[in-house]
UniProtKB/Swiss-Prot annotation, chains A, B:
UniProt name for this protein: Histidine--tRNA ligase
GO MF annotation, one: ATP binding
Assigned GO CC terms: cytoplasm
Chief site of localization: cytoplasm
Entry keyword set: Aminoacyl-tRNA synthetase, ATP-binding, Cytoplasm, Ligase, Nucleotide-binding, Protein biosynthesis
Subunit structure: Homodimer.
Cross-referenced Gene3D superfamilies: Anticodon-binding domain, Bira Bifunctional Protein, Domain 2
Disulfide bonds: none
Originating species: Rhodopseudomonas palustris (strain TIE-1)
GO biological process: histidyl-tRNA aminoacylation
Length: 509, 509
């Protein structure tokens, strides 16, 4: 027996992990969010500037948290000229390159904003995306605490512009100098301990997820997780660990009495670390920042010092901030969800300097748009309802060109409309099923009889759907049934459709 | 002598070739364009859907023009699981994957639009970008000529919505079947000649750039370009070349008499190739399409058959279209620029089928947003004028918090405002220079005297700039000088600034 010819293998339609398609509701929600954020950032005097998706790998630097191998976490490839290029993993590192490259032409301080996709080559995991959107604002060329204060206030204003009520978010403020001071005080300051300090930083950054005990393990020899994987710790001794934990226990959440951060800062200053000048400078920064925010009416209900905040990115050098959503809500399966951080930022005085060879202070704030959008969707702040679809002009034999002309007439009047482009032999029922699936407000019907009379039938699909839920034979039903399909002259079609759209409250946008 | 310690090498701030940063005017122009295109596409009944930047390399397929090595032209890298992934080189191939993956849930025909960045790993060259923006619409699941006709009409409507006057653009329409028919007729039909046909296609696609003689060389043995590089040709014999050139000479530009494409199509049908059924089917398609477009009022001044159009992408199977800008204009250096194609598309009946193993007809249209934007900017259709900057509150000693509060007050009233965040010891002159560079409409000044009196000075920077061009000592000058800086009570500041903004016609957006 001869072998059967092999059937050619079909290509499988699928996406690489950590990537997602986006439908109409999601796209509309992102657009609405982006517009609101932009409005706030522009009110704060920031102007747009955008950089491309790729940068030279060395220009981006290696500042990602949780990455032990070089280049891990970043999508990189070698260019034709052998140089390595990478997709941006955030919007800050590319901005630093941009400012350095255009330094002399830019106003200083240089205040700019941008949003766009960033890429991280993360390990697989639920909810871990490899492409997501950020919206950043940065002030480069100012070392003033007022610049940091502004970022915190803008973060708060942005949350409220997005419909998150006061009390449901918190901008948490800390200073890398405070932790640095403690680490100096316990004997791991200096360049020779730079790696160890980084491990400490990453351990503290996991406080939310692992709790104090987990952090304690990571400050010591290390920690074995549920899967049995072991993460090496910072190898601090027992006394050193106790000191760091003391600091973390002093977050100062308990003693807010009059909306001022002063009391918490006084307490921190009372710690024995304050003999260390770095620690003490960190406190002074925070005093200046909170003095400004509080004078502008932002009390501890909105902006609050919290020394558990460290931010994972390596490039921060001073004040750091994080926006936390305080909403507890349930996911689709009824499980409680705590959103945690939806944005953050801080001072990165070293990032532009890498290119310039001179100090260039800078501070910035970044919103995780994709993450925040997921949160807002869950609390119902973003519409998930599909928009009304287009008016569908159905097709029954005859000349396609005639039907197409009706469509053109509707479109010319600004009405979203389309010709049924499926098989023109499909029944009215099949064409209506399509219109329903498109969420169309109405359909236009013209058979040969209507054509001869110069009329069209207009079928109100919104009313039609209501009818389906009414008891038949009642007066209301019969009245509505008459209203749900009616005829008019061809040249009245536009006006009648416009009336129907208004009657049904259809407004596209 | 001991060696000097090496100075650490400064990182160079630069972008990889073929990538560009974008400033405020460019970003605003893209936004305006995208909004207008979206409005037209939605009026045509298309709904948004977006795919991510990456796809599996095999899902994208290899359809790029001008690429001889596999994978050339595409940015690809190997994922952790050894599978190859690539950045999308257009928006059509990813859509085909999306439709195939979600086939059962989608309405059919499925009409969708999307815009976004695409990436091509092009060889270096002026004006050749490796990241650019496209805006696409596609109808998947309809083989109707009405679907193709709609793409052509939408292309025309979009150009006009973007401010390109009728007569300054042309949608050119052709059919791959016509060329295929000719190639069958001259003996290079069939699977065994697939590569040769592709070389012919690419040769014709270069007609604009190389002229008939260059195409003739590429149809034959090949062509040596100015740099001495040799491109191998399709190796057609003299008779075959003559036949293809005959076709190209029959573009039919000369005989437009009444705005109808019929005459041109009649002429094509008169060619001896029309005994070939593929050729003849191609003509019939075009007759149906142009019948629809002409019935809807789109004459040959807007949509015209032209058999020199082939489109470079391999995946087209039937009608193809291209939008050409007919504007001749000059670049910054006064050299004439002809923009050529700013968009195009066609029918790609095989692209979704690769995944489905069943026929899925589809047609689409794509605007090269970046390319069109360059053209519109050059003809002055897009504003290049920078927007007004924010109101700048200047700083003179005293408490920063007090100045910041003024800024917060202005912002709360919806006024774009910022604190001067440069060195607070900078002189008024230095701070004004910054405000000028930001294009600020006015600045707020409060020294210690003003503070004691509870007043602020408002400096009108727009009027100030006008003053600089007036002769001094004239009445007008003195009057304006008084108007250009005035004082008011602190609590009148918002109202006075709002008046000034209105007086100077400052409207942010």
């Amino acid at each position: 027996m001869a072998e059967k010819p092999k059937k050619p293998q079909k290509l499988r339609a699928r996406l690489p992990r950590g990537l997602a398609d986006r439908g109409p509701a999601e796209i509309a929600a992102t657009r609405a969010m982006v517009e609101k954020i932009r409005e706030v950032y522009e009110r704060y005097g920031f102007e747009p500037v955008e950089t491309p998706a790729f940068e030279y790998t060395d220009a981006l630097g290696k500042f990602l948290p949780d990455q032990d191998r070089p280049n891990e976490g970043v999508f990189s490839l070698q260019d034709d000229d052998e140089q390595w290029i990478s997709l941006r993993y955030d919007l800050t590192a590319p901005l630093a390159r941009y400012v350095a490259e255009n330094f002399d032409q830019l106003p200083k301080p240089y205040r700019s904003y941008r949003f766009g996709w960033v890429f991280r080559n993360e390990k697989p995991g639920p909810g871990r995306f490899r492409q997501f959107m950020q919206f950043d604002a940065d002030t480069v060329g100012s070392g003033s605490p007022a610049a940091d204060a502004e970022m915190c206030m803008m973060a708060a204003d942005t949350m409220e512009a997005l419909g998150i009520p006061r009390g449901s978010y918190l901008v948490k403020l800390n200073n890398r100098k405070i932790l640095d001071g403690v680490l100096e005080a316990i004997g791991i300051g200096g360049d020779e301990h730079i790696k160890q300090r980084l491990v400490v930083l990453r351990a503290i950054d996991k406080l939310d997820r692992l709790g104090l005990q987990g952090v304690e393990q990571l400050l010591g020899e290390g920690r074995k997780d549920e899967s049995g994987d072991f993460t090496r710790g910072a190898s601090l001794n027992a006394g050193q660990i106790r000191d760091v934990i003391t600091l973390l226990n002093f977050a100062g959440w308990g003693d807010i009495v009059d909306g001022s951060n002063t009391h918490t800062l006084d307490e921190w200053e009372g710690l024995r670390f304050s003999v260390n000048s770095t620690f003490s400078a960190g406190i002074q920064d925070l005093r200046q920042i909170t003095k400004i925010t509080e004078a502008s009416g932002y009390d501890t209900g909105r902006i609050r010092v919290d020394n558990t905040v460290v931010r994972g990115l390596e490039y921060y050098t001073g004040p750091v901030f994080e926006v936390e959503l305080l909403l507890d809500t349930k996911d689709e399966k009824g499980r409680p969800v705590r959103f945690g951080s939806v944005g953050g930022g801080g001072r990165y005085d070293g990032l532009v300097s890498r290119f310039r060879g001179e100090p260039v202070p800078a501070t910035g704030f970044s919103i995780g748009v994709s993450r925040l959008q997921a949160a807002l969707t869950l609390i119902g702040q973003l519409g998930n309802k599909p928009q009304a679809g287009p008016v569908v002009v159905t097709v029954f034999g005859g000349e396609i060109a005639g039907y197409q002309k009706m469509v053109a007439t509707l479109r010319k009047a600004g009405i979203r409309a389309e010709l049924y482009l499926g098989n023109p032999k499909h029944s009215l029922g099949q064409q209506m099923k399509y219109a329903d699936k498109r969420n169309s407000p109405c359909a236009i019907i013209q058979g040969s009889d209507e054509k001869q009379q110069g009329i069209v039938q207009i079928k109100d699909l919104i009313l039609g759907a209501e009818l389906a839920s009414l008891e038949k034979d009642r007066d209301e039903y019969l009245k509505k049934q008459a209203e749900a399909q009616f005829s008019c002259k061809e040249d009245e079609m536009v006006a009648k459709v416009q009336e129907l759209l208004q009657r049904r409250g259809v407004a596209w946008g």
